[in-house]
C-alpha cells in the first residue's frame, strides 16, 4: 500500500496491493481525508469519535470478516485489495475504483504440471513474505493448507519457525494434529486456548 501526493494537480493517490497483504484505512470528515496503515493512528485524531459500527460487528460475528470495506469503527473504512482512491484537494472529494481484478481462466495443464507450478508459486510467495520487516510466524491448524505452508517455510529458514495454534478446550481442537506437524518441522510452537471468559475480558481493550 502507498500514497502519492501530486503537487501540480493537487490530488492524493492511495492504492492497496492486489491481494491485500498490507492494510490501508481511511476516514473522510467534512471534506478532509485521513489515512493510515493502522486504525489506531486515525483514532488519535481529536475529531474522530470511537463509535462501534454495529453493522460491521454483526458481519464479523456472522462471517468472520466485514463486507464492503467496513471496519468495527464508524466512519473508518478499509481500502479493499486491488483498489485505488483519488482525493481531489480542490473540491475535497474522492473516488474509489478497482485497478486490478483476479482473472480466472480454465487450464489445460496436466496434473503433474499443475502440481509443479503450484509448488513453484507457493515457494515464491513464501519467499516474498520472508522479506517482511516484522518477525515471521504462521498459524498452524494441523490441516492440509497450513501444514504445507509451515513445511515449506521451515525448509526456507535457518531458525525454527514460530507457529501458533488456537483451541477452545473441547474435542474439536486441533492441538494434536498441529503438534505432529510442529514436531516434524521442528517449529517453535505455541498453543493458545481461548475461552468465553478470556474473550469477554479482552473485549474492552480490543475496542
What are these regions (language model features)?
Residues 1, 71-74, 126-127:
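Generic recognition of flexible, low-complexity loop/linker segments
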Residues 2, 85, 182:
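Residue-level signal for inorganic ion chemistry
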Residues 5-109:
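N-terminal segments that mediate ammonia production and transfer
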Residues 7-33, 48, 89, 103-207:
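ATP-dependent adenylate-handling active sites, centered on carboxylate activation for C-N bond formation
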